[in-house]
Amino acid sequence: TDKNPVVFIQYGTGCPFMDIAHIKSCEAWGADGVIHFDPSWGARTEGFLEGYITHEEDGSIITYENLKSIKESLAPYTLWQVRAHRGLNTPETVVIAGKIGADLTKINIAYGSLSGGTDPERLTVDAVAAIKYAAEFSMPFDVVTNEELSGVPAYKAFAGMLIVSKLGLRLGGKPILQPLFCYSPEVMINGQMEDNYVDFNAAKIYCLRNIVNAPIWCGAPIGFLTQTEDRVQSSLMTALHASLASSLGVDGISIASSDEAFSKGPITAASRIDTLRATQASFRFFGHANMEPTENAKKWAEEMEEGIEKVLESVVKNGSFIDALYQGLLGSREDGAYPGRAGRNSVLTKA
């Protein structure tokens, strides 16, 4: 129905030609958009390689040639995102992606600094430039809260997301909020998902909607850490989270394949179709009907909002966003955050 969110699939097999094959399969089975995932080491490496390059690990290497070949393969209706959010090549990635014709990118200073391995000062400087470049290319960017996966509570992650989103607006950008639908360390410890996976995820959307009127794109991918090695269970979990997102009226979702969801191992084209078909079936099942969260959802949303306000007040009192990242105000070592070191001492200050 027209109420369902835009569905993005993640790709990053390591080989651009394999990526193209997977993308074309997903287009044929109804994907609205695709997201380029690069290797994690790319975020900690200055500069880019060039040429047509493949490797046998997770993520597809960013080169102009690799991205250009992928872009040329896309159907005209397929949205294309190249993530640039967490490393030493954040602004450069936005420029390359924008030149080639990407529709969207991904930038979050807090996540990249606290869980992505990049020095907070370096990433803040780079991200400001990246947001400006994204604005020049008219590329909206999502602000994902992946630091939740490290253990940072949702309210702290959301505070960081809101700061970066406000910065994006000030710089002429078009930020999109991307909270996680996941089984995070926070809920494992505190028990918010002992009964169901609905309430806490719904609380996130209620909380954000009560604070700001902004597009919401749930990720990343939805259902992270709820899937198992079983392809049926994995696909079902993705589909149920997709239906929850649709019930909550969000604008977009990112889904993984049924094997990619739990493993950094091989990703097969068939497993991509698993989750696309399951998501389609769940949308058909619910139609305009909705899931109904319990009263806990609104209670946790209120608690989340109070936590966000306290974090933002502490950042303002501190007086420096960069120092707040170093000091753990947006996620501490006790939470599971670890300020990155890649690019440390590389920022030059004018006298």
Model-derived regions, located:
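Active-site beta->alpha loop and helix N-cap motifs at the rims of alpha/beta catalytic domains
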Residues: 1-158
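Electropositive phosphate-/nucleotide-binding environments in soluble metabolic enzymes
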Residues: 13-20, 57, 87, 195-198, ...
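Intrinsic disorder/low-complexity detector
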Residues: 14-24, 95-99, 162-166, 327-351
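Alpha-helical scaffold segments in soluble metabolic enzymes
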Residues: 25, 96, 203, 207, ...
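Generic secondary-structure signature for well-ordered alpha-helical cores
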Residues: 31-32, 206-214, 247-251, 280-295
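Short acidic, glycine/proline-enriched helix-loop-strand junctions
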Residues: 52, 56, 120-125, 264-284
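Catalytic alpha/beta core domains of metabolic enzymes, predominantly
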Residues: 113-268
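Long, compositionally biased intrinsically disordered regions
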Residues: 272-351
